[in-house]
Structure formats: structure tokens, C-alpha cells
């Protein structure tokens, strides 16, 4: 059995609560294609962010290798846009280029980017039935104003907050106000299935990034 340690850095604390179970499910699925049995362990890398995104990635790469022996560093950043082009051009690609200049015995230089279009909260609506269940309402997606593609929403987080308010407005005040968006990250990360996320090009991009790094490490065969 091969032990594979994978590091994770994200923009904020709630992102970790949502993404870690999503990432673990994604990695488990991809590991089925590996030639041998692989035990995967995802490690959150707590480190100084420095003055720039590149500093953050560099610090995490070094700490992740030295403390955990990571082979891959998953790097999350929101696109904050209708596509991920600027995030790759201004953040991911420069960070990857910088890592290639670092010694392999001090830094992990294998990066897999995770870039949700708009923001993390877009992915939280990948399974709308799971979302509706999480807020405890019988209202439908039209009543909650969460119809359509969440990656097309200008502000997905605001949509979720409004949906929580609309979905629970009929409840007694004590119940109505005891749920907010921060309560949903862990639950939805566990509840949302990979097949639902595959409706998003940004998730397919992440999945392909993982597969590419697995191929570079000779864990899965290169596809022609």
C-alpha cells in the first residue's frame, strides 16, 4: 500500500469545513484508477500567508513537505468572476512557476488548483435537494430563488443567506434565527455527491488537475 499525504490551503476557515470532505471523496474516486492500493491523508496546512498569494503557496509548500511529507498541495482560491481565467493568470500560474524554482527537497512542487467560479458558495448549491433539506424547509427552488446555475449568480453567498431567511420565515422566531450560512459548510460538504458537482466546469477542472498530478507521480496511467 502506498501512503499519500496531500496538503490543503484555502482562503478561509469555512472553506476548509466545506472542501475537505469534497476533496476526500474526489481523491477516493480517482484512487480507484491507481495501479495499486493507496491510502490518502489530507492535511490542512496552517502557515503564514505572507504578503501575497505566492508567499502563501510557497510557505505552505515548504511546511507541508517538512512537517507532513506531502506529495501534492491543493490550493483553493475563488475565481471572483464568471470564469477562472484571471485566477489562473494572476494567482495559480505565477505560484506554480515560483515553486518550480525551489529545491524539491525543501518544497512540494506539485500543485492542484481548486478554483470555484464566483466563490465557494456556488458549489454549496450543487445539490439543491441537499441544501433544501439542510435548512429544514418545504419550499422549492423557485420559492427560495435558487433556480438556475449557481455559478451564474453574481453573489452566491447572498443567495444562500436569502434562501435561509425565506425558507425559515414561517417558523417561530427562536427557530427562524438559529441557523445561518456558517452552519451549512460542513453538512453540505459531507452531503453533496461528486456526480452533482460534475455539473460544474470548475469542479471538472479541479478533478482534472488532480488526475494530472497523479499522472506526473505515476500513480495513474497517462491518457492518450
For every predicted segment, state its role:
Residues 1-3, 16-46, 57-224:
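C-terminal accessory helical subdomains adjacent to catalytic cores in phosphodiester-
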Residues 5-9:
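Conserved beta-strand elements of the Class I
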Residues 12-14:
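Short polar catalytic/cofactor-binding loops
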Residues 50-54:
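Non-catalytic terminal and connector segments of soluble metabolic enzymes
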Amino acid at each position: 500500500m502506498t501512503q499519500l499525504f496531500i496538503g490543503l490551503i484555502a482562503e478561509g476557515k469555512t472553506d476548509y469545513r466545506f472542501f475537505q470532505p469534497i476533496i476526500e471523496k474526489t481523491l477516493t474516486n480517482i484512487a480507484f484508477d491507481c495501479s495499486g492500493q493507496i491510502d490518502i491523508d489530507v492535511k490542512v496546512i496552517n502557515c503564514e500567508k505572507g504578503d501575497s498569494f505566492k508567499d502563501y503557496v510557497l510557505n505552505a509548500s515548504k511546511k507541508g513537505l517538512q512537517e507532513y511529507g506531502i506529495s501534492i498541495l491543493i490550493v483553493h482560491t475563488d475565481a471572483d468572476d464568471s470564469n477562472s481565467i484571471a485566477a489562473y493568470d494572476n494567482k495559480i500560474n505565477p505560484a506554480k512557476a515560483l515553486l518550480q524554482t525551489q529545491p524539491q527537497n525543501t518544497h512540494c512542487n506539485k500543485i492542484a488548483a481548486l478554483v470555484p467560479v464566483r466563490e465557494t458558495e456556488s458549489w454549496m448549491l450543487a445539490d439543491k435537494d441537499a441544501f433544501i433539506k439542510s435548512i429544514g424547509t418545504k419550499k422549492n427552488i423557485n420559492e427560495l430563488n435558487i433556480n438556475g446555475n449557481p455559478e451564474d449568480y453574481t453573489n452566491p453567498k447572498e443567495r444562500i443567506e436569502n434562501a435561509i431567511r425565506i425558507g425559515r420565515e414561517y417558523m417561530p422566531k427562536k427557530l427562524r434565527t438559529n441557523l445561518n450560512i456558517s452552519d451549512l459548510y460542513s453538512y453540505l460538504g459531507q452531503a453533496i455527491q461528486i456526480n452533482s458537482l460534475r455539473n460544474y466546469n470548475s469542479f471538472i477542472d479541479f478533478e482534472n488537475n488532480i488526475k494530472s498530478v497523479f499522472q506526473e507521480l505515476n500513480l495513474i496511467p497517462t491518457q492518450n
